[in-house]
Amino acid sequence: MAEVDQLCCELELTPKVKMMEFIALPQVCAMGVIECLRQLGLGEQVGIGWPADLVARREHPAVPGGAKPREAMSADTSSFDFDLLMGKVGVHAHAGENGPAASVTVTVDMPVLAGAAARCGVALPAREELRRALAAAVEAKVDQWAQMLATRPSPGPMAPVLSDYFDMVPLLGHQVAALSPNGLPMAIGAFSGLDIWGRACVTAADGSEKELPCEAVIIRAV
């Protein structure tokens, strides 16, 4: 199998937040990446796949049952086309010398990103320049989030950024299947929202709702 051309950013962050609030750190870091890419001109070609995957829109409209590229994350029956896996955000929380810290790794699939940029007519920065821009954007977003949590009472760690996060998750509002890690269906319905702890809300056809943590399920368009 050919190696994937990836850009990797590694950061050591020490946001001044409670350790229990680190649960939202992957989403906040992903927001920083997407904000940076949108500022470069990629607009609606990039987004976040819940909870913190980096995704891109496919070049050709999806056809239910049609052939899909290797990066596609949706079911074969889905017409949802914002399903190319473009990258990952990994966060390892640990005790630092001056309090809670996190080792953050952002990986970006460069061919997928380049395809999204080409569809927008955008020339990407040189590789090292792009790496620095992404790292700076992630660090700035985390600092902003930590400051929000420090200056206003928040019932959950996602609360200060939830509205902006909504706007970056293209799968919201679409029909999805919530699958256990071994592939068993846990819920099927509309991806109707997120709570202040980042849990996905799936509304079934009968109106019943389930709130599902990312540790327990993955969500795919159907």
Give the ranges of each region predicted by the language model.
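Primarily the active-site beta-strand->alpha-helix module of PP2C/PPM metal-dependent phosphatases
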Residues: 1-16
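Generic structural signal marking isolated hydrophobic packing positions
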Residues: 1-4, 53, 70
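Long, positively charged amphipathic alpha-helical accessory segments at protein N-termini or as interdomain linkers
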Residues: 13-45, 57-222
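Beta-rich nucleic-acid/ligand-interaction surfaces
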Residues: 50-58
